[in-house]
Amino acid sequence: MTANLITTLQRKDQETSGVTIGEFSNLSPYEMLLNEDGSYATNLNVYNRAELEKLPLEKLPYSDWSYNMLREVRGREYKTTNTMYRVQLGLNAQIIKGLNYDMRVQYESTSSEYKNYDSEDTFYARNLVNSYTEYNNETQEVGVSRIPKGGVLRSGKTEYSNYVFRNQLNYNNSFAEKHEISALAGIEISQYDTEGTVNPYVYGYNKEKNTSSVPPYGYGSNVDSFKNFFGNSATIEGGNTSYSLRCDRYVSYYTNIGYVYDGKYGASFSARGDGSNFVSDDPSLRWSPMWSVGAKWNIGKEEFIKDIDWINYLNLRATYGINGNAEKSTSPLTLVSVGSSVNST
């Protein structure tokens, strides 16, 4: 009897500025990141400078509505932490000659947590505050912004776990010199769980002081729209917690039998049944039965072919059967998704 145990633990911390390839590609070759005096140059890939100058910028929460990629890099702090833990256990034991028992167990757990912080100096934060400011285009009167001044913190976490448990019997034997038989049969049980949470955005966030502010009119709901600075209907981003949970369970029964005579002629049969927690009122729809039969002729070992020098290997094989996978992306029943939101006033 032999046994083995393997454990794996990984952790990866990553910190980036969140600058995308798109931001680089939108930067014209002639544009500078810094002026000669060391101040930030205005990059033109977001708003037209001439149009901005027509607005009463001095009345807005942020009179500086310009974008600069270097300023974004310095003002962002995007952190991601990924952890993975895996345990694998194996056991193999011989029962009688040619017959052995094989057991495999694996458990794996992973998590991914992110915190994206855009400081008050970033265009992302300043643009949100200004864009969500009440504005009368005719009188150029500026009202209250629905988002408080300060940085923006976005965070969330995804957790994934699974286990796989397999029991299998293997049989291999040869007898009477010309007969070979191999067979296996087993059962495999598995479960996959995924849980994800996206937290509400934290507005007016100051990383150094660890303080934040609540929007003056509350977060509202995901359908509570209003007119933003540009006169378009808008809702406050990240006002609600998003939560998801999924559990997939599977069980499989399988067998495979092969027979070879004189090393030339072979036959095989395999069958498998895959079941899952598929949403259905008909239990038969939760199972996917599959099978196949096959035959093989090793022509290369026949006497009439051995004298042909340019043929050193030749097999003729034929199989027939039904194959596939458990389908869980749809259902014969009407599925309902339920969500909720909080309307803060």
Residue ranges and their predicted role:
Residues 242-246, 254-259:
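An active-site-proximal beta-strand-loop segment
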Residues 2-84, 102-104, 108-249, 278-284, ...:
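Surface-exposed loop/interface segments of Gram-negative outer-membrane beta-barrel transport/assembly proteins
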Residues 90-100, 177:
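Short, solvent-exposed loop/edge-beta patches enriched in aromatic
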Residues 91-95, 255-271, 276-284:
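Conserved catalytic-core segments centered on acid/base and nucleophilic motifs
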Residues 1, 87-93, 167-171, 255-261, ...:
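Residues on the lipid-exposed face of transmembrane beta-strands in outer-membrane beta-barrel proteins
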